Structure formats: C-alpha cells, structure tokens
Amino acid sequence: MTIELTPGGLLIAIEGIDGAGKTTLARSLATLLEQAGARVVLSKEPTNGPWGTQLRQSAATGRLSAQDEVDLLLRDRREHVEALIAPALARGEIVILDRYFPSMVAYQGAAGLPLDALLAANDFAPRPDLLLLLDLPPPTGLARIRARGDAPNHFETQDNLERCRAIFAALQLPGKHVIDASADADSVLRQAHAVVVAALADRLRVGATHTDAEKAALELLSAGRPA
C-alpha cells in the first residue's frame, strides 16, 4: 500500500548549520517513510555531479570566491531539479533533500552576498512543502564535527556558523518548522516525523480524489511513528 500524492508530490528540505544532524535525519526519515509505504527519493546538495564535486573540493580548500561558489551551486541545482527533483515530484513521490537552496542563502549570505539576490537567483527551484530547520548552537555543531573525526573546513568556524544560523532563523519561507537539534537523534526524528504526518494529513483533507487505500496508508504512516 502506497501514498500517492500526484500531482506535485511532497518536497522536504532539511537544513541547518554543519553538525546539526541533517544527513542522519534525512536517512532515518526516508527509511521510516518507506517502511510505512511511502515512495521516497532521498538526495542531497551539492550533488555528486561535476558541479557538486567541484564545490566539495572548494569547501576543503577554500580556493573559490563566494560568487564562484554561487555560480557552481546554481548550475548544480538546475541539473538536480531537472534530472531528479521535478520528475520525482511529478510522479507523486516524497523527495527528501539533505540541504537545498536555503543553505546557499545562509552560507553565501554569511560571506557577504545580498540575501535578496541569492533568493531571487533560486526562483527556478521548486519551493519545499516542508523546510525542517535543525537549530543548533555552533559550539555544539563544531564539537560533533570533531567527534566524528572530521577536520572543520573553511566554512566551519564559530563566527561563520553564528552568521549562518542567524540567516537560517530569519528566512521567511512557507512550510518552515524549527526543530531542536541539540536533542538526541531519536528525538529529532520524532519531531520531524510528526511534522511530515501532519502535512500529509492536510494534503488528504483538502484533496477530493484520494482513495481509501491512500487514507489507509496515511493511517499506517501515522501509526509508524518512531518510539
């Protein structure tokens, strides 16, 4: 039994500063939704394509300017939207993104680029139905990065992450939900799961074409909340 959300699917973006637990939540949430019968596409930005690979290399070396990073991010995102995000949404699937355009606004905005211009440059990108913002104090995020054995890159300084956190907090986007990421991973998953179930329930309430099977699938999803 699956949940069909055509037309439009459901786009979930998971955002937050480095060390907030975005990748952990994205994977756990995708697994939980799939087990409940949802069709899920899990992806990330930057992608593993040529532009995304170049961006990750830049993050490690710090050799690109903020504007050069924006140019690569936009190329990567356009390819991502056209090849994966838009087709999956058209099929009525749930798309979960580990970072999306709000990260560009926060990180390149923290580097001094105008926030309005960064948002406008992403007008082509579908807006997320749900923006799950994992909020975390930067010292905690940096401690987590070191605990997993990674060396912080040039983005991952306390001052820069403070600026990024402030921009994330100030972003006014529909579907934004702030989640306390200082809690343990299970607690964060419970918070995110509740938000997603509520969004799916709203979609079924306003739709007139949903089948009994879809409603039963939603009940299964609701019952499958993490312990």
Curated annotation (Swiss-Prot):
Keyword Kinase: yes
EC code: 2.7.4.9
UniProt KW Iron-sulfur keyword: no
An example Gene Ontology CC term for this record: cytosol
Gene Ontology molecular-function annotations: ATP binding; dTMP kinase activity
Binding site for ATP: 16-23
Record Gene3D superfamilies: P-loop containing nucleotide triphosphate hydrolases (3.40.50.300)
Keywords annotated in UniProt: ATP-binding, Kinase, Nucleotide biosynthesis, Nucleotide-binding, Transferase
Function (record text): Phosphorylation of dTMP to form dTDP in both de novo and salvage pathways of dTTP synthesis.
Name this polypeptide is given: Thymidylate kinase
Organism: Xanthomonas campestris pv. campestris (strain ATCC 33913 / DSM 3586 / NCPPB 528 / LMG 568 / P 25)
Gene: tmk
